[in-house]
C-alpha cells in the first residue's frame, strides 16, 4: 500500500509540472550511441560498426509544442570521424513536462578523418555530405531519451598513380547513402525570454 501511495504521489507531481513557455531558448547537450550499417571499407556489404556522438543543439520554442534550431555533433567511429552541422525541429505531443516527442534533423556532414579500406583494395572512405536524422522519444522534465534513425552520405575515393606519386592521388569515385540506428540521451537547459 505504501508503494502504491508513493507511485500515485509521483504521478500527481509529474502531472502538475508546468509546461515550457513559448519564446524560451533551449540548449541541449546530447550523447548518442549507435550502429552503422553496410560500410563497404570492410569488404562486406552487411558489416555493422559501433559509433558514438556528442554535441550541442540550440533551439527556440516557437509554440507550446514546437522548437526549431541548429546543432552540431562530433561523431566518432573506430575508422573515421565526421562533424555534421544541421537544422533541427522538435515537436512534442502534449504540453506537460513528461511527454513523447519527434525530432527531425537535416544538414551537411564534414569529414574529420578518412578510413582506408580493410579488404586490401586501395580505396579510401569518408562520411561527407548529406546528413539526416529522425528521433522518436520521451521527455521527462529536462531529460530526453530516444531512439533514432540516421542517413549519411559516404564518399569513396580511389587511389590513382601510386607508382608515380608517393601515396598516390585520391580521386572521387561515388556516393552512397548509409543508414544507422542509435539511442540518445539529452539534457535540456531552458532560458527565459
Region spans (language model):
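Positively charged n-region of N-terminal signal peptides that target proteins for export
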Residues: 1-4, 20
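Sec-dependent N-terminal signal peptides
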Residues: 4-14
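Short glycine/proline- and aromatic-enriched beta-strand/turn motifs that initiate or cap beta-hairpins
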Residues: 19-60, 180, 184-193
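Feature marks short, surface-exposed loop/turn motifs that line or immediately flank catalytic pockets
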Residues: 35-37, 76, 108-112, 151-155
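Outer-membrane beta-barrel translocator domains and adjoining extracellular loop/strand segments
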Residues: 39-47, 80-85, 113-121, 157-164
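Gram-negative (and chloroplast) outer-membrane scaffold detector with strong preference
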Residues: 55-118, 126-135, 140-142, 178-193
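Outer-membrane beta-barrel proteins, especially TonB-dependent receptors
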Residues: 157-184
Amino acid at each position: 500500500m505504501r508503494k502504491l501511495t508513493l507511485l500515485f504521489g509521483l504521478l500527481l507531481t509529474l502531472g502538475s509540472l508546468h509546461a515550457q513557455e513559448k519564446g524560451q531558448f533551449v540548449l541541449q547537450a546530447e550523447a548518442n550511441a549507435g550502429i552503422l550499417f553496410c560500410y563497404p571499407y570492410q569488404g562486406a556489404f552487411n558489416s555493422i560498426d559501433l559509433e558514438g556522438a556528442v554535441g550541442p543543439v540550440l533551439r527556440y520554442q516557437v509554440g507550446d509544442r514546437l522548437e526549431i534550431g541548429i546543432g552540431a555533433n562530433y561523431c566518432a567511429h573506430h575508422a573515421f570521424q565526421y562533424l555534421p552541422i544541421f537544422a533541427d525541429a522538435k515537436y512534442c505531443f502534449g504540453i506537460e513536462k513528461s511527454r513523447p516527442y519527434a525530432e527531425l534533423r537535416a544538414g551537411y556532414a564534414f569529414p574529420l578523418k578518412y578510413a582506408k579500406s580493410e579488404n586490401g583494395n586501395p580505396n579510401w572512405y569518408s562520411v561527407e555530405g548529406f546528413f539526416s536524422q529522425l528521433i522518436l522519444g520521451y521527455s521527462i522534465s529536462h531529460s530526453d531519451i530516444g531512439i533514432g534513425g540516421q542517413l549519411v552520405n559516404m564518399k569513396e575515393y580511389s587511389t590513382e598513380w601510386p607508382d608515380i606519386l608517393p601515396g598516390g592521388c585520391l580521386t572521387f569515385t561515388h556516393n552512397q547513402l548509409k543508414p544507422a540506428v542509435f539511442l540518445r540521451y539529452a539534457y535540456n537547459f531552458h532560458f527565459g525570454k
